[in-house]
């Protein structure tokens, strides 16, 4: 009884704190020495970071810390609701044991000019099992300085008790085979599983894992026995964008895709990319991409995790100077957001926008987003163009909070690769 009362009181305290001030749970790297953060299922590095309860397909978490000396690090997880604010659950309710553990799997870089340690761990693992589905905020920090967070990232745990069928089309409610794509989806469930679909469910829709333009829905279009339909909703109409641009820096001694030259200037390799052109006025051109993802790879080594070097990567965009906003490089390597260190700056002598980033050898997808002043949502139209034929990744996550429940359960998700 005492344990129950303590749990309830802790939950009420956390709820009060969350209501008093919103917590910043956006993915972000807070220490510039942390690089190449990746979270993905072990079966496919290009799938979203969602673990299905009871599955053997665990999530792999990997990152580098740039230093000559090893740093002893820990991680923790915190349960969040559908809107990514912390839930009222206490750790003992959502994970086994403690909600934090040491990162014990790490290795020093080998034969690289940039010295780093590569860290790896999986979730769930022997130290930590998930009791509850939903969103989880992952935090990594120094063992002896837990208040200083190195980075935080998002992952999810899914029950997979419903089937989510996602469709995307260029025949939208605002135009036909023009500049937009419209998403619709159904949620199929067993009778009795969802008592009040109109009030229990929250659906979250994202395009290419971007966070700046994801959509939250709290009311379905239609409910029928065993099925919920989300359709003809203006919020589900997305600018179509364009196929992601691609570069490769997998080989330091030969030509790479999208790279003009690779040179060494102490202490770094430098990769000067070919100058990009704005594509808004150009016809659509198909290219098979990974929808913004990246992979670490050194073509000259069997141990890419520790034998891939870092290069100062020079992006440049041939574009007239634009006012009233900013241009950003965006991809999974920018945490899916237009980030400050990925802002392009106009170079008057060359007449181009430029940005320099320290990136590990690999294959990268990226695009240029225009963010108007006063907005946090990136636009593809001004630079990349919005082409209805574009193949986009649309992820739909469905959460359920029955009456009287204290947290949002992630009951299912679905992915569509299309839009035509």
Residue ranges and their predicted role:
Residues 32-79, 176-187, 300-315:
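Contiguous beta-strand segments within globular domains
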Residues 82-84, 128, 142-150, 210, ...:
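Short acidic/polar inter-strand loop motif in beta-rich domains
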Residues 1-23:
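Bacterial Sec-dependent N-terminal signal peptides
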Residues 96-119, 211-218, 314-361, 373-402:
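Aromatic-rich carbohydrate-binding modules that target alpha-glucans
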Residues 20-53, 160-174, 289-302:
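Short, compositionally biased P/S/T/A/G/V-rich stretches that sit at domain boundaries
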